[in-house]
């Protein structure tokens, strides 16, 4: 087996004051806390040689190679990142239970795997709008999201310079990049939904695949007969892609062209090795609409489309809600697992209550932790700006951190190997009042240190056996240490 050192697996090494060294899963890769001086320089083409060796194959999907029993360099790399055997990664991809998004034209990518038997991953959405954001700002948001731990990033740009924005995001990204191609297709017809057609869509798909997009959200499950099922919903159709296609279906009174031409879409996927993320265009946008007939009818169609994609050796993940109260979350996972035969589930939250605009990174992280525990493979983050506006850098950070917490909580609940190690190290540092180690082991060391130092900024307080909450006389952990010391001196044994 190829050694980790040769593969240069991107771990973040945290060295503690007691000599312990902890290596955490790391998404920055070659960026490692920095970014190129000029985004137009991009980052190194990490996979270039690997891709060239397979360039003459007709299918570039990792599933294609996995089904042939071939362990690709990408599978080996992802396996080392997960501390798992490469053969296990290959077998999970071959049966469709995991995907490894990796377009042949995104050589900068550092491979990772998405599946319920691996670490729960998180996605961050970036992208401009008609109102704001430059290319440079979006590349900066990309680096910022990756810095805080985003495993994949989706470019959802709907404003100016969509093609160029996406190009520089890809050339600067060590993580998989996803898009929703229908957005750019709509821009090509100047926002007139009725003018969309399969030719324009396939042209857009080819353009984005040629650039190197690793996975596409395709809303092929929004069928004409499902649209009336949304009539009595409080919030109707809340997916942008879903609403675009529903409007097209009604305008022409024809079936969704993404559904009727799904085989042509798969040909593009196969050519470039793009993974498909089957979009939930009829997901619930409010608690009242959760788990309704419209949502689950579409899910049945997504199960059908999954089988069609797998026949062509195309990797598939299934997108999910949305807005779901806690008591209905498990049903979503159980049904998706059954209908889509364990294809990875990729959910937006879900948000568990609708009463907290400005805090939906919290309302959704609650649902995300639960649905991750039940088996969801990747969680799409929600920022504090959800339902209110375009997120800025700080919103992106808050969303990513909230979802890193949710994903890790899910890994702990699932008993994922090694998930508890960091918790144990931090708990030990906390009990021993090793403040600097606590900061280093935190998901957000900067914030942890800032909060501690607000009232106790002096260096000597970094070894103090108390914080500003309890002071020197009321700290329970300090008192416990004194109790243990007393018991040891008196040779008092635990009965």
From Swiss-Prot:
GO terms for molecular function: 4 iron, 4 sulfur cluster binding; carbon-carbon lyase activity; zinc ion binding. The keyword Repeat does not apply. Substrate binds at residues 125, 154, 183, 219, 239-241, 280-283, 319, 346. Keywords: 4Fe-4S, Iron, Iron-sulfur, Lyase, Metal-binding, S-adenosyl-L-methionine, Thiamine biosynthesis, Zinc. It is an enzyme of class 4 (lyase). One of its GO terms (cellular component) is cytosol. Pathway: Cofactor biosynthesis; thiamine diphosphate biosynthesis. GO terms for biological process: thiamine biosynthetic process; thiamine diphosphate biosynthetic process. Its cofactor is [4Fe-4S] cluster. Pfam families: ThiC_Rad_SAM. Binds 1 [4Fe-4S] cluster per subunit. The cluster is coordinated with 3 cysteines and an exchangeable S-adenosyl-L-methionine. Gene3D superfamilies: 6.10.250.620, Radical SAM ThiC family, central domain. It comes from the Bacteria. The keyword Metal-binding applies. [4Fe-4S] cluster binds at residues 467, 470, 475. Its EC number is 4.1.99.17. Catalyzes the synthesis of the hydroxymethylpyrimidine phosphate (HMP-P) moiety of thiamine from aminoimidazole ribotide (AIR) in a radical S-adenosyl-L-methionine (SAM)-dependent reaction. Belongs to the ThiC family. This is Phosphomethylpyrimidine synthase. It comes from Leptospira interrogans serogroup Icterohaemorrhagiae serovar copenhageni (strain Fiocruz L1-130). The gene is thiC.
């Amino acid at each position: 087996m190829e050694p980790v050192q040769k593969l240069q697996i991107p771990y973040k090494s945290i060295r503690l004051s007691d000599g312990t060294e902890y290596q955490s899963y790391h998404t920055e890769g070659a960026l490692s806390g920095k970014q190129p001086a000029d985004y137009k320089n991009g980052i190194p083409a990490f996979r270039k040689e690997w891709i060239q060796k397979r360039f003459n194959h007709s299918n570039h999907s990792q599933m294609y190679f996995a089904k042939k029993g071939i362990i690709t360099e990408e599978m080996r790399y992802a396996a080392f990142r997960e501390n798992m055997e490469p053969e296990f990664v290959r077998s999970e991809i071959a049966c469709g239970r995991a995907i490894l998004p990796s377009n042949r034209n995104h050589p900068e990518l550092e491979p990772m795997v998405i599946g319920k038997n691996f670490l729960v991953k998180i996605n961050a959405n970036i992208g401009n709008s008609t109102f704001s954001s430059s290319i440079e700002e979006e590349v900066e948001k990309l680096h910022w999201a990756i810095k805080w731990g985003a495993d994949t990033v989706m470019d959802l740009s709907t404003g100016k310079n969509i093609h160029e924005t996406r190009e520089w995001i890809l050339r600067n990204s060590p993580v998989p990049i996803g898009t929703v191609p229908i957005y750019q297709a709509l821009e090509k017809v100047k926002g007139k939904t009725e003018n969309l057609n399969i030719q324009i869509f396939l042209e857009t798909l080819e353009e984005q695949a040629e650039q190197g997009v690793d996975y596409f959200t395709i809303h092929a499950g929004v069928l004409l007969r499902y649209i009336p099922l949304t009539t009595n919903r409080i919030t109707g159709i809340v997916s942008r892609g879903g609403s675009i296609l529903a409007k097209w279906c009604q305008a022409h009174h024809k079936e969704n062209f993404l559904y009727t031409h799904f085989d042509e879409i798969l040909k593009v996927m196969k050519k470039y090795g793009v993974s498909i993320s089957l979009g939930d265009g009829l997901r619930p946008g409010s608690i009242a609409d959760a788990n309704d007939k419209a949502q689950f009818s579409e899910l049945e169609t997504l199960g059908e489309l999954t089988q069609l994609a797998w026949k062509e050796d195309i990797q598939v993940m299934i997108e999910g809600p949305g807005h779901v109260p806690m008591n209905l979350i498990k049903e979503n996972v159980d049904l998706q697992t059954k209908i889509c035969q364990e294809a990875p589930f990729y959910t937006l939250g879900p948000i568990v209550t609708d009463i907290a605009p400005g805090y939906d990174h919290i309302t959704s992280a609650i649902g995300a932790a639960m649905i991750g525990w039940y088996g969801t493979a990747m969680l799409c983050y929600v920022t504090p700006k959800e339902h209110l506006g375009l997120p800025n850098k700080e919103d992106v950070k808050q969303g990513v951190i909230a979802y890193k917490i949710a994903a890790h909580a899910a890994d702990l609940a699932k008993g994922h190997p090694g998930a508890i190690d960091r918790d144990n190290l931090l708990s030990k540092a906390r009990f021993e009042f090793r403040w600097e180690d606590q900061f280093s082991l935190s998901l957000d060391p900067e914030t942890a240190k800032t909060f501690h130092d607000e009232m106790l900024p002096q260096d000597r307080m970094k070894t103090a056996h108390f914080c500003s909450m309890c002071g020197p006389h009321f700290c329970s952990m300090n008192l416990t240490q004194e109790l243990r010391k007393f018991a040891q001196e008196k040779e008092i044994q635990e009965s």
